[in-house]
Amino acid sequence: TEQLEKALELISTFASGDSKKAESLLDENYIQHNLSYGTGRDAFIGSVEYLAQAPVKTTVENVRAFEDGDRVFLQTVYNFAGAGEQVAFDIFRFNEEGKIAEHWDNLAEKAAPNPSGRTQTDGTTELKDLDKTEENRKLVKDFLYDVMEGHHPEKTPEYFDGDTYIQHNTGIADGLSSLGAALDALAEQGIQMIYNTVHQVLSQGNFVLGVSEGTFAGKKTAYYDLWRIEDGKIAEHWDV
């Protein structure tokens, strides 16, 4: 679609250095939620121009791209001016004129494969079940409330097909039981992973992205979780 194409064109300007293209895609009052950058279109253009002059070229490799209403959500591997590969989720909101007006993101350093040999970005990419977009959104909203926010942890098994859970988190192996074991191990060290507020739940077909706020080991944390849903159960997970 046009929105998807525009979002992918925008992130590609980090590699191409095409500041004119970036300018044409962005609303003048572009709202930036990445805390490392200034807000507004000019700040974005400044970043593109800065990267264009860097001695090492920036690379942008999009892995997954989805659309939900006026928002596009992407999973992408960036390497900004040779600083090292980062895995990112980007969310872009479009205004009524079709310009990109707002952006949220979360990035993590690219890590070695996890205990099950999976990376932060490999696994299923096929988009399907477009007729189940809202059903799957509700499933993830309920899961975030019941399980991640801890209101009804006893319901956890209802969200999974037995122990089947393909896991791309850098520190956890496949299986629902492995997630439980990892959280127990953290708790023994006095480390809690707490989800307090869910800000956005974006959905297209069998993929749903939850954007949440909480704490990890007492530090304020943004949690971006991408889940793949299969037959009404959570089947696969990527996160930053």
Task: State the predicted function of each range.
Residues 1-240:
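C-terminal and inter-domain tail/linker signature
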